[in-house]
Amino acid sequence: MIINRLFIIIVLFFVNVNSKIISESTLNSCQGGTIQIAESIPLGLDISTNLSTHDAWMDLITNAQESIDLGFFYFTLLGGSDLDPVYGGQLGIDIFNAIVEAHSRGINVRIVQNEPSESFPDTETQTLAKLGIQVRSIDWVSLVGSGVLHTKLIIIDESSAYVGSANADWSSLAQVKELGIVLKNCPTMVADTEIAFQQYWNAADFTSLPINDWGSNYQALFNNTNMASLSLNNNNNNNNKNKNNDNDGSGTNQMYEMFLAVSPPQFQSTYRTGDIDALMDAINNADQSICITVMDYTPTTLYNDPNTYWPLIDNALRAAAFNRNVQVRMLISHWNYTSPIIPQWLHSLNQVDNIQVRWFVVPDFSTNPQIPYTRVNHAKFMVTEKQSYVGTSNWSQDYFTVTGGLSYNVFNNDFTNQLQSIFNRDWNSPYTQPIQNF
């Protein structure tokens, strides 16, 4: 850890002198590091995965040596405690207990969450705070005007991290389909991710946000024009149990380029790429294929009254398909809480040559009663022939302009092939339905 901290100090020194000049020591500095895809597969689905979100989080937390930083919308890891064990509530209990155990062995644990509400109370984080764990809440509406802190972020020892769709919720481990990226032993990239966490952590004490200048302490180390170059081992497909996953992955060290993007614009510190800019770059740079999995998609706002039109992403997808003959495939979630404004836009997209849209429908659990706000594909990712985008945001204006979120953007052929295999697995699964069905 002394080496990791020294490395981060060196990187920050070079960046603060000139954020466009990155020390040569940052290149290949993740020797021995790994990158993996972690998934939650709802119980009862006939889909296999190499690494579950539960196992990834347990590995990160139980192996922490010095620090654990957690940034989440809310915490309901114990929410399944009173349910029949068949629902999988124990998975959330495991994570909660691992956090408590880490604190008890002297690990510095920090939690930042959205301001609690009646819908998302802070019962569990109050319990953790009483044990001595540091907990802060961001009054997001006061700082931004609307929206929430919607991020899902774990940082361990300033050298390992998780970014993805899974909430700190037992159902995100057992009853909801999720996907995220796990980085281990990669202080280069995690140093940059830690900057985003520090923004959240300190913003909890702000009465207003900095206007156009977060200061040099928050300058991004990398962005979409100056990416981190990393030597990482990707063993996602070792011992692959899914017969539908046709990529066998070598598990050898390869060079990766990668950067972190953030939303909303109010949290874009100097040199930081905006999440919407990263997403748009991926679409606009695709020459052959764009495959998208996201829970909600609409070229509008989703939470305003009235909602307003925002065709930025929609126009880019249509242009890619029509002007460049890019093959676009979209898997959008349909569940009990799908907004009634969403289907019309998907039906329209599906009429465009080279665009195919399908619903992904997670069937009800085999045991009653059914648990509200579960049984849905909550993953948020895009893969093109060139890159992978894995984020925390749904695709409507609100998530990019007023809501707190992150994305990891990865450039590596093997990793892209693996994410593409996951998309293909889901696209060809029995859980998709024609867009015309709803």
UniProtKB/Swiss-Prot annotation:
Q: Which GO terms describe its biological process?
A: lipid catabolic process; macropinocytosis
Species: Dictyostelium discoideum
Residues in the active site? Answer: H150, K152, D157
Which reaction does this enzyme catalyse, per its entry? a 1,2-diacyl-sn-glycero-3-phosphocholine + H2O = a 1,2-diacyl-sn-glycero-3-phosphate + choline + H(+)
UniProt lists the gene as: pldY
What is the official name of this protein in its record?
Answer: Phospholipase D Y
Biological function: Hydrolyzes membrane phospholipids, such as PtdCho (phosphatidylcholine), producing the free headgroup and PtdOH (phosphatidic acid; signaling molecule on its own).
* Sites where a glycan is attached: N50, N223, N336, N394
Q: How is its activity regulated?
A: Inhibited by butan-1-ol.
| Keywords noted in UniProt | Glycoprotein, Hydrolase, Lipid degradation, Lipid metabolism, Repeat, Signal
- PLD phosphodiesterase domain span: 145-172, 373-399
| CDD domains from the UniProt entry | PLDc_vPLD3_4_5_like_1, PLDc_vPLD3_4_5_like_2
As recorded in UniProt, its EC number(s) are 3.1.4.4
**Which family does the UniProt entry place this protein in?**
Belongs to the phospholipase D family.
Give the signal peptide as a residue range, or say none if absent. 1-19
Look up keyword Lipid metabolism and say if it applies.
Answer: yes
Give the molecular function GO annotations.
phospholipase D activity
Protein origin, superkingdom? Eukaryota
Disulphide-bridged cysteine pairs: none
- Whether Lipid metabolism counts among this entry's keywords is yes
Q: By its UniProt entry, which SUPFAM superfamilies does this protein fall under?
A: Phospholipase D/nuclease
